[in-house]
Amino acid sequence: MNEPFTHAIPILHTLHEHGYQAYFVGGAVRDVLLGREIGDIDIATDATPDTVESLFEKTVDVGKEHGTVIVLHDGMSYEVTTFRTESEYEDFRRPKEVAFITSLKEDLLRRDLTINAMAMDINGEIIDHVGGKQDIERKRIQTVGDPACRFQEDALRMMRAIRFLSQLGFELAAETAEAMEKDKHLLANISVERKKIEMEKLLKGRYCERAIKVLISTKLYEELPGLEKDRLQDSFQTFPYYLLDGLEEVWGAVIHLLGLDEEKAVLFLKEWKLSTKLLKDAVAISRYVDCEWNAEKMFEAGEHVLLSSLKITQLKHERRIFFDELEAAKSSYDALPIKTLQDLAVSGKDLMAFRQKTSGKWIAEELDLVKKAVLHNHLENRKEAIEEWLTACDQQLEND
C-alpha cells in the first residue's frame, strides 16, 4: 500500500476498533490503479459525524449536515464522510436531503463516474461495485448508472467527465456522450465560478485537444461563456495548454487563439468571472504574442509578460518550448538599463525644476523621450547626463 494511505491507516484502525466500517474512497483509489501520484486521501465510514468527532481528538466541522468531518492526524488532514444517500436535488447541483446509511455499496452507487466510485480496505483490497476497474483498463469515462440521472442530480458532472478525459486521455462512453448532448442545457443552472474551475482543469489536461473536440461534438460549448463555434478553430483545439504554467498564461493563450481583440477579450474574461488581476495579466500576455521584440517592447511588457507571451508564441508555431530562447530573452531583459519609469535618474519634479515650468502633459512626453533614449543606450541614465542631453535637444530644435 502506498505511503499516503499507510499514514492514514490509524484513522481506519480507530474506527474499526469501535465497531465501524471504514474505507479509502474516491480519487485516491482511482489514482492507485492508474499509477498516478496520490492526492488527498478521503475516508468513508458508517460512523455518524458526531461519532467521528467523539473518536478523534482534533477535528474540523466542514459540513456535518452532509456527513463530512476533517480529522487532523500527525500533521495531515483527512476528510471522513459518513455513508449516505442523496435525494431530490435542487438547482441541478445540490441534494435537498441527505440520509446517513450503513451500506458502502449504496454510498458508492450515488457517485458521479465509475472510476471515482471505488473503495479500498485497510489491507489494500479494491471494492468495486460499478465496474470502475474495468473502465480504467478500457480507458473509458462513464457515469455510475443512468447518465441522465447523474446529470439531473448535478449538471456540472458533464464538465467533470470531460475534464477527466482531458487529464487521463480516456474515451467518453457513447451513452454518456448522448446524455450530455441531450441535457447540456442543465449547465445553465451551474454558476460560472464552478464551470470555470472545471474549464481550467480541462485546459491544463495532457489530452486537452481530445476534450475540446468532445465539448464541440456534444455541443456543451454552447452552455459556456463566450465560446462560439466559428471561433473554435483548429489552432484553439490543438494548442498544448498543459505546457503553460500559470492560469494567466492559459487564459492569455485562450483569448489570443479565439482571435479576440482587446475589448472583446476583456468582456470574454469578465463573463468567465476572472479576478481583476488575472484578467489584466491574461490580456497583457495576449497582447504581446507574436511580438517583434525590442528594448521598448520588453520595457513595456515586463519580464513575466515577455516570457509568458514568448512561450505561447513558441507553442503556437512549434508546439514546444525552446528554453534557450527564453533564457536569451531573459538575459536581454536583465540587460535593460531601466525596468520601470521609476528607475530613471530624473522624475517629473526634476524636469519641472530644470525647465522652470509648471505641471502639464509635457512632463509625460519628455519622460517618454528620455526613457526611449536610455533604453536604446543613446543616453546614460544619470541626472546630469539627461539634463545635458535635453539642453542639446533644445539647441537642435532652435537650429532647425
UniProtKB/Swiss-Prot annotation:
Any one biological process term the GO annotation gives: RNA repair
Binding site for Mg(2+): 40, 42
Record keywords, A-Z: ATP-binding, Magnesium, Metal-binding, Nucleotide-binding, Nucleotidyltransferase, RNA repair, RNA-binding, Transferase, tRNA processing
SUPFAM superfamilies for the chain: Nucleotidyltransferase, Poly A polymerase C-terminal region-like
Keyword field contains tRNA processing: yes
Residues reported in the UniProt entry to bind ATP: 27, 30, 111, 154, 157, 160, 163
Purpose: Catalyzes the addition and repair of the essential 3'-terminal CCA sequence in tRNAs without using a nucleic acid template. Adds these three nucleotides in the order of C, C, and A to the tRNA nucleotide-73, using CTP and ATP as substrates and producing inorganic pyrophosphate. tRNA 3'-terminal CCA addition is required both for tRNA processing and repair. Also involved in tRNA surveillance by mediating tandem CCA addition to generate a CCACCA at the 3' terminus of unstable tRNAs. While stable tRNAs receive only 3'-terminal CCA, unstable tRNAs are marked with CCACCA and rapidly degraded.
Other known facts: A single active site specifically recognizes both ATP and CTP and is responsible for their addition.
Name under which the protein is recorded: CCA-adding enzyme
Lineage per the UniProt record: Bacteria, Bacillati, Bacillota, Bacilli, Bacillales
